[in-house]
Regions:
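A glycine/threonine-rich phosphate-anchoring loop and its flanking beta-alpha core
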Residues: 104-196
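ATP/NTP phosphate-donor binding region
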Residues: 1-84
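Solvent-exposed alpha-helices and their adjacent loops that cap or buttress functional pockets
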Residues: 1-3, 24, 79-81, 102, ...
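Short glycine/serine/threonine-rich phosphate/pyrophosphate-binding segments
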Residues: 16, 39-43, 93-99, 119-122, ...
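Structural motif
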Residues: 29-31, 84-87, 108-110, 146-148, ...
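Active-site segments that bind and position negatively charged phosphate/pyrophosphate groups
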Residues: 188-294, 298
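A short, small-residue-rich loop immediately preceding and capping a beta-strand
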Residues: 78-101, 105-115
Length: 300
């Protein structure tokens, strides 16, 4: 038997107002797990939204990277063990650490992305690293988060470089999944995942530049929401339908090897992935698509 859980999400400047109605079905106590900056950005808004309805037992730093060691350390914190549910707040590495910790504890997980940098908040896969920050591997939970709350105001005030890198990372899904699935006899669910992957790039290419300008100004505009959905939800809709060997390809392989290879500069995940995507498209002879991605990358 196999179950597929599509992402459930709420998006908007008032997205956190929906927390009590959705989360009270799973208990009355919660903890927040995330990074220092992400908790500073989102925690006051979360506390206000749940005041008098859900008791917050504590707020905890996830660690310094998505490692099994950090996830296991979280499982030993008494307040986390006691809480009915966990609120994972932040970017991909904080979220993936909380995802694995809640998998070990068998607790309901709700995610609150404060960056539009990847699809981690809506997927079941956890991308894990060694304590030295080199890539270790990926591992799957039995399901993704129960619900994801995407506050567009919070993301509008997030660091520009993460949103910029998120645009680059999301574009890879459009091409990596069909590339990996080429020639395979796919199940209905896998075929759905491949089709979902091919819905990512249009939103990025149409709204990405204007959305990045909104983040530069710290404002919510009509372009911001569809761009956020194209970074967080659209790739996630593909990921939940396909296995690990279809979920990525050469673009992400180049990033993963980058973490283990001496290199100059400090390049964000999405930036390296987008470079890897252009290498993959060149290798595959998709020159027109490569040039389209290159022009977009240069424009931002």
């Amino acid at each position: 038997m196999k179950s597929t859980f599509f992402p459930h999400f709420t998006i908007g400047v008032d997205a956190y107002d929906a927390i009590p109605d959705i989360c009270l079905d799973y208990g009355k106590t919660a903890v927040i797990v995330g990074g220092e900056k992400s908790r500073a950005a989102a925690e006051p808004l979360i506390r206000k939204a749940i005041e008098g309805k859900i008791e917050l037992l504590g707020s905890f730093q996830y660690g310094d990277d998505a490692t099994f060691e950090n996830a296991e350390a979280l499982t030993r914190i008494p307040e986390i063990r006691k809480a009915d549910m966990v609120f994972a707040v932040g970017g991909g590495r904080a979220t993936d650490t909380a995802k694995w910790a809640t998998h070990l504890l068998k607790k309901p997980l709700f995610t609150f992305p404060t960056l539009a940098s990847n699809c981690a908040s809506v997927t079941a896969v956890c991308i894990m690293y060694h304590p030295d920050h080199s890539f270790k591997g990926s591992i799957y939970r039995d399901r993704n988060a129960y619900h994801t709350f995407i506050n567009t105001e919070v993301i509008a005030h997030s660091p520009r470089e993460y949103f910029w890198a998120g645009l680059g990372d999301a574009l890879a899904k459009q091409y990596e999944v069909p590339f990996s699935a080429r020639g395979m006899d796919l199940t209905w669910v896998q075929e759905t995942g491949v089709r979902n992957a091919q819905n990512v790039a249009p939103g990025i290419l149409k709204y990405g530049k204007a959305a990045l300008e909104a983040v530069d100004k710290g404002i919510v505009t009509d372009a911001l929401e569809p761009a956020i959905l194209s970074i967080i939800v659209a790739p996630g809709m593909a990921s939940v339908c396909i296995e690990d060997d279809l979920d990525s390809s050469l673009a992400h392989a180049i990033y993963n090897s980058h973490t283990r290879t001496p290199h100059k500069g400090n390049h964000l995940h999405g930036a390296v992935v987008n470079y890897g995507l252009q290498v993959m498209l060149t290798m595959d002879g998709q020159i027109e698509e490569r040039d389209k991605i290159y022009r977009f990358a240069k424009s931002i």
